[in-house]
Regions:
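Short linear loop/turn motifs
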Residues: 52-55, 256-262, 297-309
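Short, glycine-/small- and polar/acidic-enriched structural segments
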Residues: 13-152, 158-160, 167-173, 186-192, ...
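Pocket-lining segment of extracytoplasmic ligand-binding domains
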Residues: 78, 156-248
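Conserved C-terminal helix/tail region of periplasmic/extracytoplasmic solute-binding proteins
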Residues: 288-328
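Short, low-complexity disordered leader/linker segments with a strong preference
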Residues: 1-22, 318-328
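Short amphipathic alpha-helical segments at helix boundaries and their inter-helical linkers
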Residues: 73, 165, 260-277, 304-320
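Secondary-structure end/capping motifs
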Residues: 214-293
């Protein structure tokens, strides 16, 4: 089947790129550290089948695109679940970021440190973003008056924060400036996880027909991605040059972003790719609270845990302590 790709879609060049791909894995964003597992799996040959990994940023109908292309994708848990509720025929089968990467940043000099400090302040965010919903859920969980917070759309950049246009911003943890930068300004960070908000961050999903017709392919892709994440974090001296060749990021910036997201991919005592039902229930509840959709498709139909269980059962070495070590 010939795929009609958007102009900005680009694939990673691999030795098998000229051969017909068994499936395509689309990334909801540009190549970068947050897709290090997928990039590593492709570049290091961890996929048994020929899987083409493609960056597919800025597609407002990303989940629908995956369903239409009979493909595999990775996007935010929020974006996936809302599309599933709208009837897009897709199923999530594993986690990339086991928790949200959303954080709230303030200048250290402001003295703002806790969620309660944000009452009466200006908070910048990106319109229709995951961060906006997670922030509201955190404030509601803490019983803080959201009506007393001035939220400014499209002011969610670190430039806006440093310029004093806002008192805090909602952004992804891996987007923060590198402390080694000469112009770096010290920041305070609030993580929603520290206040009981745990939701799936990035998730892997596929069209329902691909999952039903080719389950062994999904299992192969998942195993390859797990090995890819292990490679990314086992030794930066090996992985960063490989990843830099695909992402175009400076090596130090790439290493910094990998460090920032490490706990989201490799949680203490957890397994790469694993997620639990409680995180999905929390995400469902906060989306309903935000009135962003109706649960027309129950979680039991939108999410499967079987692929993760099967992969680790068949290859227990993937979860062994020696499978990945502390970053070097």
């Amino acid at each position: 089947m010939l795929l009609l790709l958007r102009p900005e879609t680009a694939s990673i060049r691999t030795p098998t790129a000229s051969r017909a791909a068994a499936a395509k894995l689309f990334l909801d964003g540009p190549y970068g550290a947050r897709f290090a597992g997928e990039i590593s799996a492709s570049r290091q040959g961890y996929f048994s089948s020929r899987i083409e990994v493609l960056a597919h940023p800025e597609d407002p109908d990303f989940v629908q695109t995956i369903a239409r292309q009979h493909a595999i994708g990775v996007t935010s848990g929020q974006r996936f679940l809302l599309a599933s509720w709208r009837g897009v025929p897709v199923t999530a089968f594993a986690a990339s970021f086991l928790d949200t990467s959303v954080a709230i940043f303030m200048l250290e000099s402001s003295g703002l440190r806790r969620p309660a400090d944000l009452v009466g302040k200006r908070v910048g965010y990106r319109r229709a973003s995951e961060g906006d919903v997670v922030f509201d859920a955190m404030m509601a969980q803490l019983g803080l008056p959201r009506s007393q917070i001035t939220k400014l759309p499209d002011r969610g950049s670190f430039e806006a924060l440093e310029a004093g246009e806002v008192d805090a911003i909602i952004a992804a943890i891996d987007e923060q400036p590198d402390p080694s930068n000469p112009t770096f300004v010290k920041l305070n960070v609030i993580k929603p996880q520290d206040y009981g908000i745990h939701v799936p961050g990035l998730v892997y999903f596929a069209s329902n027909d691909l999952i039903h017709d080719r389950p062994s392919l999904i299992a192969d892709v998942l195993q390859g991605i797990i090995r890819g994440w292990q490679f990314a974090y086992r030794d930066y001296a090996q992985s960063v040059p490989v990843l830099a060749g695909s992402t175009g990021l400076p090596t130090e910036r790439l290493k910094f972003e990998l460090q920032q997201q490490r706990s989201l991919v490799l949680p203490t005592g957890g397994r790469i790719g694993d997620y639990d039902e409680s995180r999905w229930r929390t995400l469902r509840d906060i989306l309903l609270f935000a009135k962003l959709g109706e649960e027309d498709v129950p979680l039991a139909r939108a999410v499967t845990y079987q692929f993760v269980r099967d992969v680790y059962r068949r290859s227990p070495d993937l979860a062994a302590p020696g499978a990945w070590s502390e970053e070097k």
